[in-house]
C-alpha cells in the first residue's frame, strides 16, 4: 500500500502545476471574450467564431508535439540524457513544419466562415481578422510547447505553470492596448484579441527558452550547440507517435462542435443549458487531464529505468486518484448544480435545463477521468495508435450516433433534446474508458522485453 501512496504524492506534485497552467490558458480565453464583449456583441461573437476554428487547428499541433514528453521521460529514466537535446531540436523542426500548415489553414479561413449560414458580413470580417492576427502566434505557441514538453518529460511541471500565469497577466494590458487603441496603437476591437494572444505566445516561448538555458537541472541539455539539420528518421518517429494523439484531440474537439450545431435548432434555452453544462464540465476536466500528463511522465520515466512493475503502479495509481477526484467533483456538481447554473445565467428555464444536464455531467466526469488518464498511461507506454482507434470508435461510432438517436429522433425513446446528446457522451466516454483499461491490461501482460523494446523505440 505504501508504494501506491508514495506514487500518488509524486503524481499530484506533477499534476497540480499542470492544472494551474491550464486554468491560466482558459482564463486567457475568458479575458478575450469579456474585453471584446465590452466593445460590442459583434466583436465578442467574432472572437467566439474565430476561436471555434483556431482551437481544433492549434490542438492538432499541440497533440503532435505531445510525443516529446514520453520520449524525454524515457531517455531521462534510462540515463540517456545526452540524447534529449537532439530529440528536442527535431521537435522544433516538427513544430515549424506543422506551424506552416496551421497558418495556411487559418489564412484561408475566410472560405469556411463565409459558408456559415446567415452569418453577418461584419461579424465574418472581424472573425477572419482575428484569425489572420492570431495565426502569427502559432510558431510561438508550438515552440513554447516543445520546451514545455522537454521540462515535463524531465518531471519539471512548475515552469509551465509560472510562465502560463505570467502569460495571462501580460495578455490583459496587451489586449487593452490593441482592443481599445491605446498608446498610439489602432483600435482593433475583437481583432486586437488575436494580436494580443499571438504576442503573448511569443513572450511565453522566449521566457521558457530563457529558463531552459539557465536552469541548473538542465545544464547538460545543450540545445544551442550549433545548427541541427532536420533528422527525418527522428521526425518521422515523433510524428508517428504524435499523429494519433493529434487526431484523437481533433476528433474530440470537433465532436463537441458538431453536437453544438445539432443542438442549436432546439432553441435558446436548450443551447444555453447545454453550453453551461459543457463549460462547467470542461473546467472539471482539467483535474484528470493534468493527472494524464503526470501519468505519461511517471510511466515513461519508470519504463526508461526498466522498472516495468513500477510503471504498472504509476498507471493504476493515476487512474485510482483520478476516479477519486472525479467522484468528489461529481458529488459537488450534483449538490450545487443549481447554484452553478445561476452563476452563468439567471433565466429560470435555462437554470432548470442546465441543472438537469449537470446530473448527467456528473456521471460523464467519472468515465471522462478514466479515459483521459488511460490515454496518458498509453502515451507513457508509447502506444499511441490505440488511443486514436479507441477515441474514434467511442466518440464517432458510438457516442455521436447514440446521442443523435436519443436527442433528435423517436426511434428508441421520445426525442430527449440536449439530454439525449449527454447520454451519448456518457456512452462514448464509458466505451473509451473500458477500451483504454483493456488495452493497458493487455500491454502489461506482455513479456517485459516486449514492453521495454516498444518503449525504447
UniProtKB/Swiss-Prot annotation:
The UniProt entry's GO CC annotations, sorted and at most eight, read: membrane; plasma membrane
Cytoplasm recorded as keyword: no
Membrane topology value:
Multi-pass membrane protein
Q: Does this UniProt record's set of keywords contain Plastid?
A: no
Where the protein is mainly located, per its record? membrane
- Which Gene Ontology molecular-function terms are recorded? antiporter activity; xenobiotic transmembrane transporter activity
Where does this polypeptide localize? Cell inner membrane
A Gene Ontology biological process in which this protein takes part is: response to antibiotic
Q: Which domain of life does the protein's organism represent? A: Bacteria
UniProt keyword list: Antiport, Cell inner membrane, Cell membrane, Ion transport, Membrane, Sodium, Sodium transport, Transmembrane, Transmembrane helix, Transport
Query: What are the TM regions of this chain, as residue ranges?
Result: 11-31, 46-66, 93-113, 127-147, 160-180, 188-208, 243-263, 283-301, 316-336, 357-377, 387-407, 418-438
Q: What InterPro entries would the database entry show?
A: MATE_fam, MATE_MdtK, MdtK-like, Multidrug-R_MdtK
Under the heading HAMAP family, the entry gives:
MdtK
Q: Which NCBIfam families match?
A: matE (TIGR00797)
Q: What does this protein do?
A: Multidrug efflux pump that functions probably as a Na(+)/drug antiporter.
Q: Which family does it belong to?
A: Belongs to the multi antimicrobial extrusion (MATE) (TC 2.A.66.1) family. MdtK subfamily.
> What is the designated name of this protein?
Multidrug resistance protein MdtK
Source organism of the structure: Yersinia pestis
